[in-house]
Amino acid sequence: MLKQKIKTIFEALLYIMLTYWLIDSFFAFNKYDWMLESGGNICSIPSVSGEDRILQAMIAAFFLLTPLIILILRKLFMREMFEFWVYVFSLGICLVCGWWLFWGRFIFCY
C-alpha cells in the first residue's frame, strides 16, 4: 500500500517535471530570444504580444494537461481518492508553472 502511494507520488512529480520542461522548451518560445545577450535578463528584449502568449498557453494546455485531466476523471470514477488528490494537486502545480512561464516572469519588467 505504501509502495503504491510512493509510486503514485513519484509518477506525479515526474509528470510535473516533464510538463515544465516541454512548456519551457517547445511552447513558451519568444521570437526575440536571439536578442538575449549572455548575462542579460529577459526584460532587456522585446516580448511577444499577449495574444500570442495566450494562444501558445492554450495549445500547451491542450496537449500537456489533457492526459492529466483524463487520469483525474478515471481516478474519480474508480474511487481511488489518494491518487485523485495527488493528480489534482499536480494539475494545479502544472497550471502555476505554465502561468509563470507565459506571464509570471515578465511581471518585474513593467
From Swiss-Prot:
InterPro entries: DUF2645 (IPR022553). It is a multi-pass membrane protein. Keywords: Cell inner membrane, Cell membrane, Membrane, Transmembrane, Transmembrane helix. It is found in: Cell inner membrane. Residues 30-53, 105-110 are periplasmic. The chain crosses the membrane at residues 9-29, 54-74, 84-104. This is Inner membrane protein YgiZ. The gene is ygiZ.
